[in-house]
Amino acid sequence: GGGDTSSKTDNGSKADNGSSDGAAKIEGSIVDDSYFGDEGTDSKPVTLKVWAPDAAVSLVKEQVEAFKKAYPKRKFKEISVVAQGEKDAATNMLNDATTAADVFSIPSDQLNKLVDAGVISQVAFKDAVTEANSEETVKAATLNDTLYAYPETNDNGYYLVYDKSVVSDEQAQTLEGILEACKKAGKKFIMNAGDGFYACTFAFTAGVKIDGLEKDGITQKFVKYDEDEAVKTLQAFAKLIKDYRGTFQSLDVANIASGFASGKCGAGIDGSWDTASNQKALGDNFGAAKLPTINVNGTDKQLISMFGYKYIGVNGSSKFPATAQILAHYLAGEECQLQRTEKLGWGPANKKVQESKAVTGSPVLKAIGEQSLNACVQVNIASTFWDPMANLGNKIIADTCDPSDAAAMKKLLNETISNVRDEG
């Protein structure tokens, strides 16, 4: 492979000329020039659009420049990199795939609908990708034995981030300790309880478990759970939040880093993607831990979260399908994953990068790794899951919520599950 930045490391796929990859050689994230076919020739210069989340745009632009240098024989007219939040990428793809990006980032739960709609291409370099990335990330992007997306991260989850000058490491272990420390210092604790991605923590901690989809492929399947215990747990959350009204604030996670910077926030539940801004705001006082416990009638229960992976997908309507695949493979390759870990703090799916110092020395990735053992994996999530969970969160934190009313809490829980299953 050409290009000095990109071909130094080999991700173990050197000998990869397996069935799905054709016979031409693939060296790490660089493939044989012949894969381009007639794309990138004088008569057919390449024009592509890439969607990346805001925080990653400038780095992805650099990576795209390195990609072009890696294939000096090919003509690239323009490869644009545009900011696009991952959670809305699939919706925008489904609205109009012809105007959407050729290469885009998505969270693991969005894959099903893109495959069902037939707008995402299967991965061209399956053997190389399977060998380079951790098994669970490959498995979560495989439907009916077909790999549909390039693993990008294994860290799409959230953790406790805290100001060590406000919350001690010991206090950080319990929700009660965190709220008390924040209250004492006159600071806020921020959790976006009105967003289903975070609010499902209330239900999961209460013992509610999901198990993929029913046979119809649409309806969320739930595992039987102890309703009394679940109600008591939701009551405990409601009471604690009521007791710390004014300290507990439900705001978008973007307010956590800005709150640290302005001195208004003491701790929050934030995602791995905000690592760099939180570290910058807190400096030496940056603290990271798995989510805390909550005391339910004398027993400390670990908060259970949502956890998933992020992927790079290729648009099935791309006018440059070969180049789009080659670029996706490059951006999801070892070097690019390592750069995103080092510069953005993202947790890699690539097995070699997982062993790098950037990962082993990261308190955030350690915290997220610990939390992933107490999490529901974000695959096969019904599209009807998020809004009822957001409603559950909003009801629990509402001023009108009465934590002592078990019957009302039971009704809310049953309605939430019924709405997730769309049984209205």
Map each language-model feature to its residues.
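Conserved C-terminal helix/tail region of periplasmic/extracytoplasmic solute-binding proteins
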Residues: 16, 369-424
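Glycine-centered hinge/linker elements that transmit conformational signals in sensory
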Residues: 219-250
